[in-house]
Amino acid sequence: LNAYRTGRIVRRFLEIETYRMMALLALPMARETVSKLSVFDRRLDLLIAHMQSAVKVDKALLSEVTKLSSDVLNFSALARHRFGATKAYAEIVASRTSELREVRVEQRQRIGTFIDRRFQPAVRSVEAAERRLDELAERVSLAGDLLRTTVQVQLEDQNASLLTSMEERARIQV
C-alpha cells in the first residue's frame, strides 16, 4: 500500500465510524418511541372500547380522539427527523464499507462484516420503531374517521327526524 491508498482507507474508516455514531443517535429516540407507543396504544384501545359501547358519540369522546391524534402526530414529527437521518447515515455507512473493497484473509473476519453485524440490529430497531409509529398514526386516523362517520350518521338521523316532524306539523296545519 502506498501512502495515498493508506490515507484513503484511514479516511474511509473515520467516515464509517462518524456516520455510524450519527446513525446511532436515533436509538434513544427509538426506545422512547416504543415506550410512548405503549401509552398511545392503551389510550387508543380505551377510546375504541368506549366508541363500541357508546350509543351516542359525545363531544368528550371526539375531543379525546382529536387529542390523541394531535399527540401522536406531534411525537411523530419529532421522531421522523431523527429516524430519517438514521436511514441516510446507515446508507452512507454501507456505501463507505463497500468502498473499502476488502478481501478475506485466511480465517479472519472482514471489518465490514464486523461493523455490519453490530450496526444493523440498531438500525433495524429504529426502522421497527418508525414502522410501529406509522401504524399507530394510521390506526388513530381510522378511529377518527370512524368517529366522524358516526357523528355524520347521527346528524343525518336527527335531520331526518326533524324533517318528519316538520312534515307532520305542516300536514296538521293544512
Task: Annotate each predicted stretch with a short phrase.
Residues 1-63:
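Extended alpha-helical interaction modules
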Residues 64-68:
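Amphipathic alpha-helical surface "interface" segments used
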Residues 69-174:
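Membrane-associated alpha-helical segments
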